[in-house]
């Protein structure tokens, strides 16, 4: 369960960083 949450966070982190960098 927690593994899937961490995976989703790891997937969303790069997009979040790119959004902040914009």
Curated annotation (Swiss-Prot):
The modification Lysine amide is found at residue 22. One of its GO terms (biological process) is defense response to Gram-negative bacterium. Keywords: Amidation, Antibiotic, Antimicrobial, Secreted. GO terms for cellular component: extracellular region. It is found in: Secreted. Expressed by the skin glands. Antimicrobial peptide. Active against Gram-negative bacterium E.coli (MIC=6 uM) and against Gram-positive bacterium S.aureus (MIC=12.5 uM). Belongs to the frog skin active peptide (FSAP) family. Brevinin subfamily. This is Brevinin-1OKc. It comes from Nidirana okinavana (Kampira Falls frog).
């Amino acid at each position: 369960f927690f593994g899937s949450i961490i995976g989703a966070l790891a997937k969303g982190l790069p997009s979040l960083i790119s959004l902040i960098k914009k």
